[in-house]
């Protein structure tokens, strides 16, 4: 709750450490702004503190309100901040078992990498145990659901077996 007194709290951003291949990344857990102060850029300023002052990569939370999506989109307007989409794929979709004699698995893994990097324009950004991450350029208005639909649609056109993917958005300080 927000108190109604001088110096009262008008906004709060709660972030938590997240398993992400970019060192120091934090994920938005919750952001809230007092109703009387909404529309004044407070949420964007809170995100900006994490990115420009703390210089921590910021990963979007798993769910967003319409207002949260607008705030997230506004991050690309902060000078020196770059916003990207990412897809996380299970290693089983990109690796083959060296002891597996079936060459179809190796071919499928190579095709998945070709689609992600070639046809979808993904850039490999790293891995966490069991997962590989690829970044994508996105428009500032792109939502996680739109990115998921785009990735799923392109992968499903080529493969009958669905890959195990998760998509999201992240922002980093580039200082440029």
Say what each PLM segment does.
Residues 5-22, 52-176:
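Terminal substrate-recognition subdomain of acyl/acetyltransferases
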Residues 23-35:
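Conserved acetyl-CoA binding element of GNAT-fold acetyltransferases
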């Amino acid at each position: 709750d927000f108190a109604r007194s001088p110096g009262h709290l008008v906004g709060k951003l709660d972030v938590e450490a997240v398993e992400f291949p970019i060192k120091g990344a934090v994920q938005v857990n919750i952001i809230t702004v007092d109703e009387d102060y909404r529309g004044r850029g407070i949420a964007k300023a809170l995100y900006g503190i994490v990115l420009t002052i703390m210089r921590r990569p910021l990963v979007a939370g798993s769910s967003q309100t319409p207002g949260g999506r607008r705030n997230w989109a506004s991050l690309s307007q902060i000078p020196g901040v770059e916003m990207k989409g990412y897809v996380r794929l299970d290693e089983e979709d990109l690796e083959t078992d060296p002891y597996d004699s079936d060459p179809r698995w190796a071919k499928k893994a190579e095709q998945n990498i070709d689609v992600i990097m070639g046809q979808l324009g993904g850039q490999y950004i790293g891995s966490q145990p069991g997962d590989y991450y690829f970044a994508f350029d996105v428009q500032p208005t792109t939502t996680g659901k739109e990115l998921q639909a785009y990735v799923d649609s392109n992968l499903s056109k080529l493969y009958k077996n669905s890959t195990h993917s998760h998509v999201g958005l992240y922002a980093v300080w580039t200082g440029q």
